[in-house]
Amino acid sequence: MKNLRGFRRADRPAVLELSRHALQRPTEQVGNPLWTTRDELESELADWDADPGETLLVEEQDGDVVGFGGVEVSPGWEHADLFGPLVAPEFRGRQLGTMLLEASIERAEARGAESVLASIGARNLTGRLLLERAGFDHRGTANAVFRLNPSAHRPVEDGPQGVDVRRGSADDLDAALELYHECFPEGVFPDVAWRESLEDGTVYLAEAKGKGLAVVNIDPSDRWIYHLGVIESERSHGVGGYVLSRALQDYWDGHPGDVLGLSVRADNLPALRLYRRQGFAPLLVVESFELPL
């Protein structure tokens, strides 16, 4: 018998264990969630606009949570981000993953999302088949996911001559959007997300003689580094590594101890080398999928 219900606060320890279990096994890895600590889970969900219980789901058997799934749908965004589905090993083979996925898609549709984006570990063949059977299409190239512990960071001491790094403000919206669209022409972050990030003080800009050269956004709730981008004329000049290093140092002044993640195209060799030099450790490689609604 299937017992699907909304996610509750009391479910967090069990869901965290499902996340840890999957992350430790390449054939079971998913792009969401990547929680390894209760603090990471609490921080991310606390920042959601809607109650997580409205769009996240668990499967309960005899009082125990044995499956997890759902979506995040944020105001102003056209897509929903898929979480899971994750199923405890002893309960697999009962179509629980399919059920969780179908219910997740229904919640995305009910929230007005135009598509669902999912990511699966490159070796998670079962998860890939599940998505493809539900109509998801493979999207783009594989992404490498990294994590950085503050104690492992190797900062860049000296930046390119004449380049300054500062925290952006609401007045920098146009400049940040111009950098974003130039560096990420296929990016899906809406303007409202950039406006909110600038207002929250999580966006950093690199400039020279008043001209924007690079941008990066470090989200303290997701503990994630988004959109490290450098304009084409300044690439391979050390600007990207410098803005990232300065942004990280400033971030950790206010959030000491936070372990941060990021993802980058697995074939972007210059970026991979940059992250390795600064101490980032590889976590997993994921493939992206999309389901139009």
Residue positions per predicted region:
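Conserved GNAT-fold acetyl-CoA-binding loop/helix
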Residues: 23-45, 177-200
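Conserved GNAT acetyl-CoA-binding A-motif
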Residues: 108-121, 251-263
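Conserved catalytic-core motifs of GNAT/GCN5-like acyltransferases
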Residues: 119-121, 137-151, 263, 281-293
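A short helix-loop-beta-strand connector motif used in the catalytic cores of GNAT acetyltransferases and
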Residues: 43-58, 67, 81, 195-205, ...
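Conserved beta-strand-loop-alpha-helix junction that forms the acyl-donor binding cleft
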Residues: 92, 118-127, 232, 261-272, ...
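Conserved acetyl-CoA-binding loop-helix of GNAT-fold acetyltransferases
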Residues: 87, 93-106, 133, 230, ...
